Amino acid sequence: LYQPSYISLESALSFHGIITGFPYTVTSVTPRKTRAYLISGKEYGYTHLSPKWFWGYEKKEAFLMAGPEKAILDYLYLAFKGLRPAAIDEFDLSTIDRDMLKDYLGKMADQRFLRFTQRLKL
């Protein structure tokens, strides 16, 4: 609907089994402006994410979706910016590749965000 974008945040976290339930809104990130659409009773939300962090996704059928580690970091980055609650105590992190998560954190190269994730004991 709104390109370029990939499914991430709550929708990807739910898909990967990191959170329970499925959000009402299909949540995606985009390097473009934040937008929302209501189509046939379904809400699609697109949240701006810096173009330099527009990676870590893969093709799933006809759409792009963040891998589990990138979905966590996308969500936490928005929490860091005050746009989401930092409620990772509700996340099931048992299947997460911790080495990949650390690599991705290094790739994001934002020291304030890194300190934020360290305080969360990610």
Regions found by a protein language model. Name each.
Residues 1-122:
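Nucleic-acid-binding surface
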